[in-house]
Amino acid sequence: MSQLILGIESSCDETGVALVRAGEGGAVPVLLAHALHSQIDMHQAYGGVVPELASRDHIRRVLPLTREVLRESGERLEDVDVVAYTRGPGLAGALLVGAGVACALGAALDKPVLGVHHLEGHLLSPFLSSDPPEFPFVALLVSGGHTQLMRVEGVGRYEILGETIDDAAGEAFDKSAKLMGLGYPGGPALSRLAEQGSATAFKLPRPLLHSGDLDFSFAGLKTAVLTQAKKLGDELTARKADLAASTEAAIVEVLVKKTLAALQKTGLQRVVVAGGVGANRHLRAQLNAACARAKVRVHYPELHLCTDNGAMIAMAAAMRLQAGQQQPNRDYAFDVKPRWPLDAITLAA
């Protein structure tokens, strides 16, 4: 018997709602509809996310988005079987909005609820694409707050092979963009500008590139960009595109080479890239070329699903339920986990 799952995402500065139908057996759940509201315009004036404003905007948006998804799918709210929501990690106030709405809906409808790990949502989001991956695979999870390489044997079976010891790749993009005065959100702005510059104009470090392990470090690169920007002084405006291109090339080279090293270490022949930085064109181009040479398949989420969204939360819930690894409940006294490592939900071998 199939299940209709409503997913709500509110961990940071996007409000997302989606409906997924999960069938019996191993069939990939089907996305029926999703709606998303980004708060970028609201936070631009502040140069970054203001948590209190983010929480208030989630309150305004989540129910209208739910109605939009129901209209688009042709489904009725009372036919929803499970209400899933992002339990963490993320901004505490923002998480509480999504959790509160999900549990209120569950209580009103007498339907069970399920808290989902935000990073697992990203990790499983490529299953929403027209070319879903198969287990096992190496996953590169790369976003503003996280950079990790994992061996993924199945839903809930994650082995962390390496992770950042300081800044995440997305943070390196954003902070470097801020140093160049590119505004918010910095990462996409830096990547657009990089298309006009030379990736070899400046010699920037590739931290831990030859460390022999699969960990990452981007703090030193960020410092090098700051030093270079100060050295340029008045020339920065004229050389900004070159500095952006050189910065992007340094970050991407590390991500690609570490991913290839993870493939070599595990012997796997499939890569999944997930998280907001997975939308970066240069990363996709370089990783595609490297994987083609290595005869390895690479999978990404659809571009519009690289950002935070409700579809990935509904999908993660559906896949957990299908695998019989987690059961929804009617305990509506919810809690959230602003800090929640992915290995905390990994099943024992």
Curated annotation (Swiss-Prot):
Entry EC number(s): 2.3.1.234
Catalytic reaction list: L-threonylcarbamoyladenylate + adenosine(37) in tRNA = N(6)-L-threonylcarbamoyladenosine(37) in tRNA + AMP + H(+)
Entry keywords, A to Z: Acyltransferase, Cytoplasm, Iron, Metal-binding, Transferase, tRNA processing
Coiled coil (residue ranges): none
GO cellular component term of the entry, any: cytoplasm
Top EC class for this record: transferase
Binding positions for Fe cation per the UniProt entry: 118, 122, 308
Record localization: Cytoplasm
Residues that coordinate or bind substrate: 141-145, 174, 187, 280
Superkingdom, natural source: Bacteria
Note describing how the cofactor binds: Binds 1 Fe(2+) ion per subunit.
Family annotation (CDD domains): ASKHA_NBD_TsaD_bac
Gene Ontology BP terms: tRNA threonylcarbamoyladenosine modification
Cofactor(s) in the UniProt record: Fe(2+)
GO molecular function: iron ion binding; N(6)-L-threonylcarbamoyladenine synthase activity
Function: Required for the formation of a threonylcarbamoyl group on adenosine at position 37 (t(6)A37) in tRNAs that read codons beginning with adenine. Is involved in the transfer of the threonylcarbamoyl moiety of threonylcarbamoyl-AMP (TC-AMP) to the N6 group of A37, together with TsaE and TsaB. TsaD likely plays a direct catalytic role in this reaction.
Alphabetical list of PANTHER family matching this protein: TRNA N6-ADENOSINE THREONYLCARBAMOYLTRANSFERASE, TRNA N6-ADENOSINE THREONYLCARBAMOYLTRANSFERASE, MITOCHONDRIAL
Family stated for the protein in its record: Belongs to the KAE1 / TsaD family.
Name of the protein this chain belongs to: tRNA N6-adenosine threonylcarbamoyltransferase
Source species taxonomy: Bacteria, Pseudomonadati, Pseudomonadota, Betaproteobacteria, Burkholderiales
